[in-house]
Amino acid sequence: MRRTLVLVRHGQSEWNIKNLFTGWKDPDLTEKGRTEAITAGKNLKKAGLKFDIAYTSALQRAQKTAQHILEQMAQPDLQLIKNSALNERDYGDLSGLNKDDARQRWGQEQVHIWRRSYTIAPPNGESLRDTGARVWPYYFHHIQPHILRSQTVLIVAHGNSLRALIMVLEGLSSEEIVLQELATGVPIIYEFNADSTILSKKIIQS
């Protein structure tokens, strides 16, 4: 019996190309982002996958990516559960700011610490650990039970919420996880053993 989880970071958003801190702000996908999502769906269909249930965040860039993926897989009516527990990390006072402007205001080193530290949050925002504190319970209580019942599950979310999830799935340290980079619109496929250990991991590049 297959126990499969597919993770996809949303396609490129309008704020990605403007070099802005996005966080819980809600910009739409760019045309490139829509193409990335469509390509992801085609590649997942080509890989022979069919989802039993799908999860996404409360933000439209993730929701629309999920919808494009499911349309390409001929599953447009599949149940898509939306929850803010899967939202991007909240960047607090950095949200909406240009990253270069933020470096000028607070200094390059401080901004780098806020972006890449596991425990240090920007003013009025979340650290990666804070993000994990909402992602992990939601995954274990709501999503993992489907996988353990040998279902195939899709999660479309964000760079940091997925990074936090990958940390627990792969047993990575706080030092290792902050170095992980996730490309937009690129599916990561995990197969699990009955005891929830990873049997295989595959990244589908277009």
From Swiss-Prot:
Catalysed reactions, semicolon-separated: (2R)-2-phosphoglycerate = (2R)-3-phosphoglycerate
Pathway the protein takes part in: Carbohydrate degradation; glycolysis; pyruvate from D-glyceraldehyde 3-phosphate: step 3/5
Taxonomic superkingdom: Bacteria
Family matches, as SMART domains: PGAM (SM00855)
GO molecular function: phosphoglycerate mutase activity
Subunit description: Homodimer.
Protein name: 2,3-bisphosphoglycerate-dependent phosphoglycerate mutase
Encoding gene per record: gpmA
